[in-house]
A protein has these predicted regions:
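Short, compact, well-ordered microdomains
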Residues: 126-150
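Histidine-centered nuclease catalytic patch
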Residues: 102-133
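Generic structural hydrophobic/aromatic packing signal, biased to beta-strands
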Residues: 47, 75, 120-123, 134, ...
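Nuclease and nuclease-like effector domains acting on nucleic acids or nucleotide cofactors
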Residues: 1-110, 146-171
Length: 171
């Protein structure tokens, strides 16, 4: 849609009102519960689809993005000693960890679609998604850690331990 079309549709009053709203501090706005619920459903859907794929296919053969090799190589260069078997929140979200993760994530801005979207990650690679075994990370952190788990054979146990399930969306 052309910008002229937007301004014609809104008119001068609409544009001024929009500009005044956008110039207000973010703290003045509450999170819309319906938007949060839709986001949570989308994150859960992504987790279910990924886990069902893990239950069905040899993880070493999985291709998550067109940039898998670059993501994995960069991840292991920057985090050579990070064990991805059993993670804890501190390793991903402490101030020190955030300082190290931020530049890694930003390398994929404009490269990996939705690189900064919130995505659920399993803390223990041998477990399924659950309240106790899931944490919210950026999409690029999810890709980096799951690619490492897949390439390093850590997700191999999933196919024998779990079976694909129907999506909660269809129930």
């Amino acid at each position: 849609m052309a910008m002229a079309s937007v301004s014609n549709d809104l008119g001068a009053e609409g544009l001024v009102a929009g500009a005044s709203v956008l110039s207000r501090p973010a703290e003045e706005f509450d999170n819309d519960p319906s938007v949060e619920a839709m986001w949570a459903m989308k994150a859960l859907e992504h987790a279910e689809v990924y886990f069902n794929i893990l239950c069905s296919v040899d993880p070493k053969l999985l291709k998550l993005t067109p940039h898998d090799e670059n993501i994995y190589k960069t991840f292991r260069e920057e985090f050579p000693d990070l064990s991805v078997e059993k993670l804890n929140e501190e390793k991903l979200k402490s101030p020190e960890a955030k300082q190290k993760w931020r530049p890694f994530c930003e390398k994929f801005k404009g490269v990996v679609e939705d690189y900064s979207f919130g995505t659920l990650l399993r803390l223990d690679n041998e477990g399924e998604y659950s309240n106790e075994n899931s944490i919210l990370v950026t999409r690029i952190q999810f890709y980096a850690i799951e690619l490492a788990r897949n390439k390093e054979g850590l997700n191999d146990c999933i196919r024998s331990k779990y079976k694909p399930t129907k999506s909660s969306k269809n129930q």
